[in-house]
């Protein structure tokens, strides 16, 4: 289980994989996945630049185009790319108002308020449903390939046994492939709107845990 303090990293990996610049460069494991299931049907992801008081809210993107709320993944099915003018031109598509401009750098596609919608069960219910597993509360380092989806990260947290939290775990490694991981996600209902990229606590089955 990814606690909501760290689950936004999964949403971030999805955003990077559907970034138009990565699609145009042919460097994303989701490059051929438009209108196809990429995640469990419990997963919907929305980019909402018009959310009131959202940390990433703005009416116009870094190239002056009007922004709009976009459902990017709907019930697990990929519905769109994040595009600026350059990546849209390379892909022969219309820009989507997702250009972000940094100080001294050219515009590039990016998210605004990137939200993985909550599920129907509580975090405690997710924990109680696990016979043996790992509650991840902190991530340490990263080895994630957006080309292949291969995923390996250091993590710490707590061991779960018989649906109950046991002792602490430090310096473990969790590994899998994002293609498989996304298909095995169950979201909790504990979404917390405190950042511009947010996700609820997530149960992901079938991952490898070493060093716990």
Question: Positions of the model-derived regions?
Answer:
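Dual-mode signal for accessory low-complexity, basic/Gly-rich regions
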Residues: 7, 31-212
């Amino acid at each position: 289980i990814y606690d909501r303090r760290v689950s936004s990293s999964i949403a971030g990996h999805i955003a990077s994989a559907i970034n138009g610049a990565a699609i145009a460069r042919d460097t994303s494991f989701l490059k051929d996945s438009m209108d196809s299931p990429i995640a469990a049907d419990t997963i919907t992801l929305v980019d909402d630049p018009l959310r009131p008081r959202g940390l990433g809210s703005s009416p116009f993107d870094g190239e002056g185009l009007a922004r709009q709320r976009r459902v990017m993944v709907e019930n697990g099915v990929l519905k769109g790319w994040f595009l600026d003018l350059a990546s849209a031109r390379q892909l022969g598509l219309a820009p989507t108002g997702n250009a972000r401009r940094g100080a001294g750098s050219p515009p590039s596609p990016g998210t605004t308020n990137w939200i993985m919608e909550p599920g129907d069960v509580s975090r405690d219910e997710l924990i109680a449903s696990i016979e043996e597993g790992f509650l991840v509360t902190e991530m340490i380092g990263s080895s994630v390939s957006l080309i292949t989806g291969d995923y390996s990260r250091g993590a710490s947290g707590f061991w779960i046994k018989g649906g109950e939290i046991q002792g602490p775990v430090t310096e473990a490694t969790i590994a899998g492939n994002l293609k498989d991981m996304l298909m095995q996600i169950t979201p909790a209902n504990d979404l917390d709107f405190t950042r511009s990229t947010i996700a609820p606590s997530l149960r992901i089955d079938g991952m490898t845990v070493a060093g716990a």
